Amino acid sequence: MGNYADNAYYWMKRNGHAPKYEHAGIYCIKVDDKIVYVGKSRNMLRRIAAHYAHIQMGTETKYRILSEARRKGHSLGFDVLYYAKSKRYADINTELGEKEGEYIRMYSPILNT
């Protein structure tokens, strides 16, 4: 999986996604503009690239669901919900943990189970 995720990461960087996603923060996966998953990462670009790889491989139930949705013509997308404000590693983890919970409660995404 590592090579596929690395390839997706470098493709995303080459195509101009780094300024938006290469940060610590809270991101979401959308199907037809509906938030279906909320996650946190110290580097959202790397995490989103890993999600792309997993969707291609269908390695877990949530990724098989997303792959099937795409196969049926639904649009899949990613977006940033929140950028971390803290700079220290421990503070970022605490901040993102709290914010992730807030966004999960706010959106009740079906794939956060």
Question: What is each stretch, according to the model?
Answer:
Residues 1-46, 90-91:
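GIY-YIG nuclease catalytic motif and its immediate N-terminal context
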Residues 19, 42-90:
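Conserved short loop/helix modules at catalytic or binding sites
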Residues 99, 103-104:
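Serine endopeptidase catalytic core focused on the charge-relay Asp
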